[in-house]
Amino acid sequence: MSTDVSGEPKVATVDMKLEVVTIPVSDVDRAKDFYLSLGWRLDADFAFGKDVRAVQVTPLHSGCSVTFGSGLTTAEPGSAQRLELVVEDIEVARDDLLDRGVKVSEVFHRDGGELLPGPDPERRSYLSYASFNDPDGNGWLLQEVTTRPPGRVWED
């Protein structure tokens, strides 16, 4: 880690944003159909020669997109796990996915290290979840966040 002249760690001063996460899939068209069925925006679908194809989709209002295709990664299809999507209401989000034909787990919450059924009784942020997989088994986790604590919101 780099330090300043006093030996303290340097604080990042360059604005960097996570733009894209690449997930491995076995069937590009099947994956594209699945993610579009979630209501995600299609940003790009193009080929580079005959061996590389890239599809980019973005969840509603997300600052980060998801890319998949052929020739993009050596990871095994289905090996991406715990890809987290933040939602304001876990039950509404789960119902929306069910209405779209997605197989979604029941809502569960964390109490200490234990996972229990249903949303967090106090509906505290970061503690209620539901999970689903894409057709290849890449694992997604819905996480309910209603309030971000200080330090988790960027100040300009």
Language-model regions, residue ranges each:
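Vicinal oxygen chelate
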Residues: 1-14, 46, 55, 85, ...
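Short, solvent-exposed beta-strand edge segments and adjacent coil->beta transition regions
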Residues: 15-20, 78-82, 127
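Residue-level recognition of conserved beta-strand positions in structured domain cores
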Residues: 59, 68-70, 144
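Residue-level signature for short turns and capping positions that connect secondary-structure elements
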Residues: 62, 71-73, 147
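Helix-adjacent hinge/juxtasegments
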Residues: 69-93
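Short hydrophobic-acidic sequence motifs that mark active-site Asp/Glu residues
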Residues: 17, 65-67, 139-141
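Acidic di-acidic motifs
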Residues: 27, 89, 134
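Core segments of cupin and vicinal oxygen chelate
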Residues: 13-16, 22-65, 92, 99
